[in-house]
Amino acid sequence: MWWRDLTRLRLWLKREAIPGEGRKAAKVNAGVGEKGIYTASSRGGPPSARSKAVTVVAEGAASRSWLSMDAPELGPGLVERLEQLATCPLCGGSFEDPVLLACEHSFCRACLARRWGTPPATGTEASPTACPCCGLPCPRRSLRSNVRLAVEVRISRELREKLAEPGARAGRRRGGRIPTMGCLDLPGEDMRKTWRRFEVPTPKSSNSEDDLPEDYPVVKNMLHRLTADLTLDPGTAHRRLLISADRRSVQLAPPGTPAPPDGPKRFDQLPAVLGAQGFGAGRHCWEVETADAASCRDSSGEDEDDEESHYAVGAAGESVQRKGCVRLCPAGAVWAVEGRGGRLWALTAPEPTLLGGVEPPPRRIRVDLDWERGRVAFYDGRSLDLLYAFQAPGPLGERIFPLFCTCDPRAPLRIVPAES
């Protein structure tokens, strides 16, 4: 039920907002399931005004921490990401009566009706309908209500309303900092205090995604709602690249490996390959496991040395140059980050930008494409910390494809399946 999901989400947000508490605080909060209780209406409905959800925790857990009132976001932009997940790609607003297509994309029912037009009269031939995001044929009869997404929209709205309350920025002490407890509130205290940990944002979450409560998959589902199920397009791969049988990993082929014939869509100098799926609207995410790899700014396709591996991951426009030297920057229709020498660089012009504090580069990189906003952002795939974001002045204007570039036969780049 949605109110139970909301209660659990509140609990997880409270734990995420505790900086510096480390594993000890995480374990204290995660243990509420054993020593804590929740009270709700006896008939299983949502908590009423007379029966609010109250959490009781074991004694001795009241470690005190100080949280800043001036941090811009909750964790690494958690609330903003939840709102993005609850946004219709057609109208740009929160989902209203969301429906799910056969291709797993969701839209407002009214927005989709306007896009597809009026249904044909009975007895006449129906005009073909397709998904506005991926273009796959989706008959009208395949529409079904997305109840789970509707619940997530409601959770997102309530979070935003709570963060917008005047009390969220009241009660400043000690130069803009207020005391909060490292444990949950005791029974009988004002319920507004149970919101304080996400009313008072923290600049960085200390817990990784893998540390989320195992019995609460809704949070992971919300963060991964836009994760695309990608495969590689062998027809675009440089002839020296080796694509796996499942088309989810790529590496430089060992010497002596037979090369496929050249083609008009292949990169002939840059050791790169594009994803088979392109996006011309909406928001889409994918994750890449880099292992020890990192990208090759030398687009000659030759190894620069035998001791250092290279990779680049990101996105490229359909118009990206396939033959000759490729401009690895937004002006060349490429938005990517590069790992080399144990460091991570954003491929900007005229020179790449070193991303300080990202050493060594994360083993998983999450690419977040927002086509309408013209934004391509990169996150640590496990902590979800923002690494870098490219921002165009408007929509990207063409179909965008995932981009993978590697110069190492020992460390392949692997697409993380959407369900991982």
Swiss-Prot record:
Alphabetical list of Pfam families matching this protein: PRY (PF13765), SPRY (PF00622), zf-RING_UBOX (PF13445)
Catalyzed reaction equations: S-ubiquitinyl-[E2 ubiquitin-conjugating enzyme]-L-cysteine + [acceptor protein]-L-lysine = [E2 ubiquitin-conjugating enzyme]-L-cysteine + N(6)-ubiquitinyl-[acceptor protein]-L-lysine
Zinc fingers (RING-type) by residue: 88-135
SUPFAM superfamilies the UniProt entry points to: Concanavalin A-like lectins/glucanases, RING/U-box
A GO term, aspect molecular function: zinc ion binding
CDD domains: RING-HC_RNF39, SPRY_PRY_TRIM7_like
Location(s) in or outside the cell: Cytoplasm
Entry's Gene Ontology cellular component terms: cytoplasm
Gene3D superfamilies: 2.60.120.920, Zinc/RING finger domain, C3HC4 (zinc finger)
Keywords tagged on the record: Cytoplasm, Metal-binding, Transferase, Zinc, Zinc-finger
One Gene Ontology biological process: negative regulation of cytoplasmic pattern recognition receptor signaling pathway
Pathway: Protein modification; protein ubiquitination
Signal peptide: none
UniProt main location, coarse: cytoplasm
The organism's place on the tree of life at top rank: Eukaryota
B30.2/SPRY domain boundaries: 210-420
Region annotation (Disordered) ranges: 246-265
Function: Plays an inhibitory role in anti-RNA viral innate immunity by targeting the adapter DDX3X and promoting its 'Lys-48'-linked polyubiquitination. Alternatively, enhances the cGAS-STING pathway activation by promoting 'Lys-63'-linked ubiquitination of STING1, facilitating the STING1-TBK1 complex formation and STING1 activation.
Stated name of the protein: RING finger protein 39
Organism, scientific name: Pan troglodytes
Underlying gene: RNF39
